Amino acid sequence: MSFLVLPPEVNSALMFAGAGSGPTLAAAAAWDGLAAELGQAANSFSSATAALADTAWQGPAATAMAAAAAPYASWLSTAATRALSAAAQAKAAAAVYEAARAATVDPLLVAANRHQLVSLVLSNLFGQNAPAIAATEAAYEQLWAADVAAMVSYHSGASAVAAQLAPWAQAVRALPNPTAPALASGPAALAIPALGIGNTGIGNIFSIGNIGDYNLGNGNTGNANLGSGNTGQANLGSGNTGFFNFGSGNTANTNFGSGNLGNLNLGSGNDGNGNFGLGNIGDGNRGSGNVGSFNFGTANAGSFNVGSANHGSPNVGFANLGNNNLGIANLGNNNLGIANLGNNNIGIGLTGDNMIGIGALNSGIGNLGFGNSGNNNIGLFNSGNNNIGFFNSGDSNFGFFNSGDTNTGFGNAGFTNTGFGNAGSGNFGFGNAGNNNFGFGNSGFENMGVGNSGAYNTGSFNSGTLNTGDLNSGDFNTGWANSGDINTGGFHSGDLNTGFGSPVDQPVMNSGFGNIGTGNSGFNNSGDANSGFQNTNTGAFFIGHSGLLNSGGGQHVGISNSGTGFNTGLFNTGFNNTGIGNSATNAAFTTTSGVANSGDNSSGGFNAGNDQSGFFDG
């Protein structure tokens, strides 16, 4: 495997465990000795030949013998020079190695970082070590980058040294021997052919359509990618934009998962850095659907919360609305207990400040249930208002553990979602950190599919924009694993290609067949900037549709959407709907998600009224 994708534990260990520069310096000394011997032999041979020509060799035969001996003397002199050059290059190679070893991170430092991480994680019972864990991971990324930089420098220096070596075949070819040309051609006969087609670069093996070097896959733009359709370096997966992503559809660097927008995320659909889980917005979150940083749990809106559906910072528990609460459904600050309405209380159901004891079943008004500190709730332990369910700190939710508003489902920190674990808003699905997505694990916006960090895609694992298909890091493509733009087919790193595996930019207006307009890919589209099949862009937006059979204003995503624009999913009309068969107009630029809703700013299903969650509300 390439050093570009190896962690510092491996690169550092390999560099420090090797034989060092000793054998190379010994080889340099041997080459110096050989050069001296060859030089002495050349001088002796020339002297002997000259002496014979002056004494024993006479006549035409002597002239012929001297002419035959001269090339051997010349070859010995050339060989001595070549040996001296090889010695110099061996010394240079040793110097390059020593410089690379000095720049490589000591394995003990890497081990100390990993030991520190394990210690912090094991003692992180209440999330108090989250900042230190994030800092340790950031330091580890720097160690990784330092090792890769050292190895890249080593590779470059060693390649430069090797390029200076003169081939011995030229010297062999000068010998007056009929077998010399055959011997000289030996290395050329052993050269490995380029095992790929349509690549621009070197070392792309069994692959097509790459721009760059050492890619094992197709349609990449960049170097050392193991996968297809990547834009960047050393990605292990497909459709990534960035460096060393392990997964697909990521935008940025060193993500382990899919559809992440940011760095060092472990999971999918995260927007931020150092998250572990699904659909988080922010940094250092452990869990799903959190908005903020260093939360441990689900659907927290704030930072340093431990638990779920907390709205504020830093709370420990569930559905607290405020700051520094320890317990459940407290509305206020610095409370210890359950369903307290106020500040600095210790107890259950207290209304007021600085109280100790047990109050009413519900501290809010108009509630049906128990432990509600908000108003007009039906259920248990709601600190928000107008909720049906339990543990909601937001308003107008149908479900549980929602810290956002007007959600149908559970664990949503965003607004008007139908599903669960969404930190974004207007989603139909789960684990989305972006907005208006149909599917799961999307950190981008208005996608229909899985693991997209880009926008307006119909498909999965796209880090580009407005693609119909999968694993594209480019834009406006119909197909698979394209790192170029406006292509129809697969594995293109160039632009406007139809077919498979081209690194070339074509001088045409559209790719595909039957398209009318400019910037289209796919089949039978009309208008501008569409991807997919039989889409018609008649709106004022320059950007068109992705998917199949969409019509009307621009930027519909999915199948058979119509209306003024920005619908994602299936059979939606109107404006800014996500889901199936919604017809809301959302005149105030709100969002509707779910199934067959006609009301604005609603989630769920079959709601005709505005600002509704759940099902069948008028």
From Swiss-Prot:
UniProt keywords, alphabetically: Signal
Its signal peptide is 1-29
Could you provide one GO biological process annotation from this protein's UniProt record?
response to host immune response
In terms of superkingdom, the source organism counts as Bacteria
Q: Where is this region: Disordered?
A: 598-618
**Pfam families linked to this entry:** Pentapeptide_2, PPE
Q: Which InterPro entries match?
A: Mycobac_pentapep, PPE_dom, PPE_sf
Q: Which family does it belong to?
A: Belongs to the mycobacterial PPE family.
The name this protein carries in UniProt is: Uncharacterized PPE family protein PPE16
Tell me the classification of the organism that encodes this protein. Bacteria, Bacillati, Actinomycetota, Actinomycetes, Mycobacteriales
